[in-house]
Curated annotation (Swiss-Prot):
Disulphides: none
Catalytic reaction(s) noted: tRNA(Asn) + L-asparagine + ATP = L-asparaginyl-tRNA(Asn) + AMP + diphosphate + H(+)
Protein name per Swiss-Prot or TrEMBL: Asparagine--tRNA ligase
The EC number(s) this enzyme carries: 6.1.1.22
Keywords assigned by UniProt, alphabetized: Aminoacyl-tRNA synthetase, ATP-binding, Cytoplasm, Ligase, Nucleotide-binding, Protein biosynthesis
Length: 467
C-alpha cells in the first residue's frame, strides 16, 4: 500500500482540493451497496461526522472485502471527491484498502440502537458510539475551556493532594488509604485501630475536595484554581452521584461573596458559550437525538443575568407554592437543606432562569463559611441550574481566627488535623472566597444527558469498579 500521510476526517471535511490522493484511517460504522459498488461509512473519532468511502468491488480482492464488517479498522488510500450526496461535502473514491484490524462477529455495537444501560456494561467500547464520541469530545473541550478561562484571568493552576488526612466537608464519607494487613489490625485498649505503623503514620484517605489546600495557595498567590479527581464514599445509587468525579475549585484572596457570585456566573457562561462555539456538531447531534431543548436551554443561560436570592426568600417562594397546591416529595421549612426538586422549582417553574441562592442557615453548611452578623446564616452561595439543581457550591470563607476555632469545636472536628489551616488565620489573614463546580454536573447540563454515569468514561459507583 502506498505511503500517504493520514488526514483526520475532521480536517478532510474542510479540504477542497478535489482530485488529490488522501489517506484516511478509522473504524467501519456501516457498509451498504450493490453488487458493483459499496459505500463504507468510516469514522476516526475526530468528529461526529463519517466520511463515505466509495468502493468499486471489481477493483478489490473478494476475501479482503469479506473482512470489512461493522467495527473493522481500515486504512484507505483514495481520491478526494466532491460528494453528490446530501449532508456531506466530500467523499473518498477508494484506490487501496488495508484491513488493519478485523472485527469478530460478536462485536456488540451493531447498527441497531442500544440502551444506555447496556452501553454502561460495555464502557470499554461505548466511546465508539456516536453518542459517547460526542459526549467525550465535549468533555475534552470543557476541560480546555476551564483552563483557558482561568489562565486568561490571571489565575494559577494549583495541584492539591489526592491523599489527605483532613475531611474538608466534615461528612466522614471518605475512602481510606492504607498499607496495613486488614486481617491483622493493631488496636488500642478501646478497640480503635492504631495507625502508627501505617504508611503515613496516621489515618489517611482519598480527598473529598482540594479546597482547604487551595485556600492556603490563594493566601500566597492571590488567585488559584484546582481541577482534579475527588472521591466520596457515599452509598448513593442515583443519576446524580458518583464515587469518583472531577472538581474545579477556584479560591481568590480579597474576594467577598459578591465577587464570588460574579466569578461563578462569568465562569459558567464562558463554558456554555465555548461548547456552543467549539462543539457545534456534537451539541447539535445530542440536541437532535436526546434532548430537543438542549441548544435552546444553553442559549437561554447566556441571555439573562442569574437571579440572586437569599435562602430565606427562596423558602418563602417554595412555601407559597405549597400553599397553592404544589406537591413536593420533601417538606419545605426554614433550615432544611433544599432537595433537588426544590432547587429545580425555583429555576424551572418560578424564575425560569438560573438562580444563585445565598445566605444559608449555618447549621446545614460547612465549618469554614463566613458567618453573617445575624449569627444564624453564613455567606454561602449555590448556583442552581435547570434540569440539574445545584451545579456550583461556594462561599466567602471565615477569616476570623476565633470564629473559625469556635465553629471547628462546635462541629467536633479534631483540632490536631486543622492546625495548618488555622495558621492562615493567624499569619496575615484576609477576606477570601471560592467555590466548587462538579465537572460532571456541568457536562450533564451541556450534553443533555440524564445520568451522570454517561458523562464520565468509567463511572465509579457502589459495587461498580469495572474497567
Amino acid at each position: 500500500m502506498e505511503k500517504i500521510s493520514r488526514t483526520k476526517i475532521v480536517d478532510l471535511m474542510k479540504r477542497e482540493d478535489f482530485g488529490a490522493m488522501v489517506n484516511v484511517k478509522g473504524w467501519v460504522r456501516t457498509r451498504r451497496g450493490s453488487k458493483q459498488v459499496n459505500f463504507i461509512a468510516l469514522n476516526d473519532g475526530s468528529t461526529i461526522n463519517n466520511v463515505q468511502v466509495v468502493v468499486d468491488l471489481a477493483n478489490f480482492d473478494e476475501e479482503m472485502l469479506k473482512q470489512i464488517t461493522t467495527g473493522a479498522c481500515l486504512s484507505v488510500n483514495g481520491v478526494l471527491t466532491e460528494s453528490v450526496g446530501a449532508g456531506q461535502k466530500a467523499e473518498v473514491q477508494a484506490r487501496e484498502i488495508e484491513v488493519l484490524g478485523t472485527c469478530d462477529n460478536t462485536y456488540p455495537l451493531q447498527k441497531k440502537g442500544h440502551s444506555m444501560e447496556f452501553l454502561r456494561e460495555i464502557a470499554h467500547l461505548r466511546p465508539r458510539t456516536n453518542t459517547f464520541g460526542a459526549v467525550f469530545r465535549i468533555r475534552h473541550n470543557m476541560a480546555i475551556a476551564i483552563h483557558k478561562f482561568f489562565h486568561e484571568k490571571g489565575f494559577f493552576y494549583f495541584h492539591t493532594p489526592i491523599i489527605t488526612a483532613s475531611d474538608c466537608e466534615g461528612a466522614g464519607q471518605m475512602f481510606q488509604v492504607t498499607t496495613m494487613n486488614l486481617y491483622d489490625l493493631k488496636k488500642d485498649a478501646n478497640g480503635s485501630i492504631v495507625y502508627d505503623d501505617d504508611f503515613f503514620g496516621k489515618q489517611a484517605s482519598l480527598t473529598v475536595s482540594g479546597q482547604l489546600e487551595g485556600e492556603l495557595a490563594a493566601t500566597a498567590l492571590g488567585a488559584i484554581y484546582t481541577f482534579g479527581p475527588t472521591f466520596r464514599a457515599e452509598n448513593s445509587n442515583t443519576p446524580r452521584h458518583l464515587a469518583e468525579f472531577w472538581m474545579i475549585e477556584p479560591e481568590v484572596a480579597f474576594n467577598e461573596i459578591q465577587e464570588n457570585m460574579d466569578l461563578a456566573e462569568e465562569f459558567i457562561k464562558y463554558c456554555v458559550r465555548w461548547a456552543l462555539d467549539n462543539c457545534a456538531d456534537d451539541v447539535k447531534f445530542l440536541n437532535d437525538m436526546f434532548d430537543k431543548g438542549l441548544i435552546e436551554r444553553l442559549e437561554g443561560v447566556l441571555k439573562e443575568d442569574f437571579v440572586r436570592l437569599p435562602y430565606t426568600e427562596g423558602i418563602k417562594i417554595l412555601e407559597e407554592a405549597v400553599a397553592k397546591g404544589h406537591k413536593f416529595e420533601f417538606p419545605v421549612y426554614w433550615g432544611v437543606d433544599l432537595a433537588s426538586e426544590h432547587e429545580r422549582y425555583l429555576v424551572e417553574d418560578h424564575f425560569k432562569r438560573p438562580v444563585i441562592l445565598t445566605d444559608y442557615p449555618k447549621e446545614i453548611k460547612a465549618f469554614y463559611m463566613k458567618q453573617n452578623e445575624d449569627g444564624k446564616t453564613v455567606r454561602a452561595m449555590d448556583v442552581l441550574f435547570p434540569k440539574i439543581g445545584e451545579i456550583i457550591g461556594g462561599s466567602e470563607r471565615e477569616s476570623d481566627y476565633n470564629k473559625l476555632m469556635t465553629r471547628i469545636e462546635e462541629m467536633h472536628i479534631p483540632m490536631k488535623d486543622m492546625w495548618w489551616y488555622l495558621d492562615t488565620r493567624k499569619f496575615g489573614t484576609c477576606p477570601h472566597s471560592g467555590f466548587g463546580l462538579g465537572f460532571e454536573r456541568l457536562l450533564l447540563f451541556v450534553t443533555g444527558m440524564s445520568n451522570i454515569r454517561d458523562v464520565i468514561p468509567f463511572p465509579r459507583t457502589p459495587r461498580n469498579a469495572d474497567f
